[in-house]
Amino acid sequence: MKTTRTEAIILNTRDHGESDRLVGLYTRSGGRLQGIAKGARRSRKRFANTLEPCSLVELQFREKGTLVWLESCKLLEPFLSLRTELIRWGIAALISEIVIEMVPEGDPQPELFELLKETLRQLCEDKDSLNVALLFIFRFQDKMGYLPALENCGICGRSLRSATKWCWQVDRGLLACPDHPVERVRALELDLGTLLLIRQCRSLSLDRIWRLRFLHDTKVQLFYGLLDWVRGHIRKELKSLKLLQQAHST
């Protein structure tokens, strides 16, 4: 049976049976996978401190049915700073849940792996966790093929730079200029500067997008508007959002 060694990010874990643990993974070579760590709850040596969510590890596994069987796991980066602040941890958990819910299993996307890894690193270093989350979601939308061009009005074709105010229906991928009133219940009202910033999330290299900064007044609207889009796409609530809302209320 073929054995594979690869870098991976632990997305989530849960107990399975009396001694095992199920592990959600995003791997560099195999994309999103579901693994089982046999005896992980009993052995203090084999997987000690290596299966914590939002950790970067090096895995050795073999495929067996619908699960991969974890043979060994070496901790590369625990991203400890995520665990020192509830808001950081809540956003990291939310990002992991988005990947679990929206990325199909067994579809390798090395660029998505790098995006996830770098996002966790930025969450540790950047004081503006919400800005990091927005940059991740927009880049994620682009890599998954959901982010529209945002170059002109989707109704009349008016160019983006010809107006300062726009309306973006995220669930439909429709950008509308002021000449075309659209249903605003599920739409984001954005200015030209914000739209140009979103477009830069697509065009800049990964190491440069973290310099982009959304205005304070638009970040919250964008964040919850995008989460509405995620919930509409997966057709259920995001469990980790409750943790994040709890963190903001404390």
Swiss-Prot record:
Q: Keywords assigned by UniProt?
A: DNA damage, DNA recombination, DNA repair
Q: Which Pfam families match?
A: RecO_C, RecO_N
What biological-process terms (Gene Ontology) are attached?
Answer: DNA recombination; double-strand break repair
Report the GO terms under cellular component.
bacterial nucleoid
Could you confirm whether the keyword DNA repair appears in this record?
A: yes
Q: Which SUPFAM superfamilies match?
A: ArfGap/RecO-like zinc finger (SSF57863), Nucleic acid-binding proteins (SSF50249)
* The keyword Kinase belongs to this UniProt entry's keyword annotation: no
InterPro entries registered for this protein in UniProt:
ARFGAP/RecO (IPR037278), DNA_rep/recomb_RecO_N (IPR022572), NA-bd_OB-fold (IPR012340), RecO (IPR003717), RecO_C (IPR042242)
Job of this protein = Involved in DNA repair and RecF pathway recombination.
Family from the record = Belongs to the RecO family.
- Kindly provide the name given to this protein in its UniProt entry: DNA repair protein RecO
Say which species the protein is native to.
Syntrophobacter fumaroxidans (strain DSM 10017 / MPOB)
What broad taxonomic lineage does this protein's source fall under? Answer: Bacteria, Pseudomonadati, Thermodesulfobacteriota, Syntrophobacteria, Syntrophobacterales
Gene that this polypeptide is encoded by:
recO
